[in-house]
């Protein structure tokens, strides 16, 4: 068993993205003078949800990919999963700040969450298949 250094590298970049999302929420809270909730402000609500959505998906996916990497999955597959996650998490918040009828909404928000869920399912199925095959 080895340390999941590939996953760790991507996690460092994802952590910076997460910090950027948090800073955006703080900036909007200060600008709109809203301490709790979203103050019925659509921009603040979008920023809060982009930040929360990241926190809802990234930890479990990163944990699963780290486990796959530690179990000896090929470096190329680890890079593929983590690069897809990074792309998805870059796209999703961009789509949160545009109108729902725009092409940016469909490509960024819808595409970002679709790619996120695809990586989530792929990582889960890879773990299950490795367990079924007796690979630990």
What kind of region is each of these model predictions?
Residues 53-65, 120-121:
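Core segments of transmembrane alpha-helices
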Residues 23-49:
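Cytosolic, membrane-interface loops and tails of multi-pass inner-membrane proteins
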Residues 91-119:
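Interfacial loop-to-transmembrane junctions
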Residues 62, 68-98:
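Mid-chain, well-packed structural core segment of small domains
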Residues 124-136:
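Juxtamembrane boundary at the C-terminal end of a transmembrane helix
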Residues 13-30, 86-96:
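Transmembrane alpha-helical segments that form the membrane-embedded catalytic/substrate-channel core
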């Amino acid at each position: 068993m080895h340390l999941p250094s590939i996953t760790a590298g991507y996690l460092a970049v994802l952590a910076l993205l997460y910090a950027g999302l948090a800073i955006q929420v703080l900036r909007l809270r200060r600008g709109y003078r809203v301490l709790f909730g979203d103050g019925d402000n659509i921009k603040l609500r979008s920023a809060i949800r982009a930040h929360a959505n990241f926190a809802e998906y990234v930890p479990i996916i990163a944990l699963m990919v780290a486990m796959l990497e530690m179990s000896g999955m090929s470096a190329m597959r680890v890079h593929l999963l983590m690069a897809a996650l990074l792309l998805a998490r870059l796209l999703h918040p961009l789509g949160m700040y545009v109108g729902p009828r725009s092409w940016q909404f469909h490509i960024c928000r819808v595409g970002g969450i679709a790619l996120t869920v695809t990586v989530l399912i792929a990582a889960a199925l890879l773990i299950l298949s490795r367990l079924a095959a007796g690979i630990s």
